[in-house]
């Protein structure tokens, strides 16, 4: 999970924000550090333990809506957190769909 947080939550997140800035947009990072908007639980599999793979339980929209009202572009890393504060890697397409549905 350390590598996932570094690559998705920091490196790629920052690259996208830089890209947006280069093209006139202002991105705001929603990652595992500041805005923990993805509440998740560990994904269950009957055959094997999937490790730190999660599924979305809930998207917290308050901070997302505030940033959108300020014309900021949310850049969301697909990293959720469970009830025990454990970080979980979630499929980015699933996160995008859940965010769209929650908004």
Task: Kindly label every feature range from the protein language model.
Residues 1-103:
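Nucleotide/pyrophosphate-binding catalytic subdomain
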């Amino acid at each position: 999970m350390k590598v996932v947080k570094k690559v998705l939550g920091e490196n790629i997140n920052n690259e996208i924000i830089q890209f947006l800035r280069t093209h006139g947009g202002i991105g705001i990072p929603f990652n595992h550090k500041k805005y923990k908007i993805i509440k998740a639980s560990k994904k269950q599999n009957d055959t094997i333990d999937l490790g730190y793979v999660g599924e979305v339980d809930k998207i917290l929209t308050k901070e997302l809506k505030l940033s959108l009202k300020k014309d900021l572009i949310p850049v969301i890393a697909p990293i959720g957190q469970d009830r025990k504060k454990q970080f979980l890697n979630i499929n980015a397409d699933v996160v995008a769909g859940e965010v769209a549905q929650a908004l």
